[in-house]
């Protein structure tokens, strides 16, 4: 989740994601990823965004992505290993917002490899962070 800035669409996605799981773990895209996405440095750094995301009531854990490309494949593997070490029988679900679909994301390969279910299209695409930061 870039959350740069957080808007109601992000909150809706988190709320709907939390309805699917006992504990919601959120990946916060890092500063390098934010710059790759927009072509300019993020106006809210990764720690700032992580602090905001952690404060949302639906979120149980948040960590900054370790990936250096635009995906979160390596971070999914890290989460998978952490979660399975805590509860080997837990089902892990990777969720995406209203404008992201499983067959279009690079994370599908790692999710398929680890048997992680993907639930996409969570929430309506009612807001766009890019539009919010334009003057």
Question: Which role fits each region the language model picked out?
Answer:
Residues 1-135:
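Nucleotidyltransferase catalytic core that binds NTPs
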């Amino acid at each position: 989740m870039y959350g740069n800035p957080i808007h109601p669409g992000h909150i809706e996605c988190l709320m709907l994601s939390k309805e699917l799981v006992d504990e919601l773990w959120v990946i916060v895209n890092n500063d390098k990823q934010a710059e790759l996405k927009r072509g300019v440095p993020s106006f809210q750094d990764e720690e700032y965004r992580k602090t905001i995301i952690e404060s949302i009531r639906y979120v149980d854990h948040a960590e900054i992505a370790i990936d250096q490309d635009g995906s979160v494949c390596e971070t999914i593997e890290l989460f998978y290993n952490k979660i399975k070490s805590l509860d080997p029988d837990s089902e892990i679900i990777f969720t995406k917002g209203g404008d992201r679909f499983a067959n279009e994301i690079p994370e599908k390969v790692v999710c398929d490899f680890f048997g992680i279910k993907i639930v996409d299209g969570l929430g309506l695409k009612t807001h766009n962070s890019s539009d919010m930061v334009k003057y």
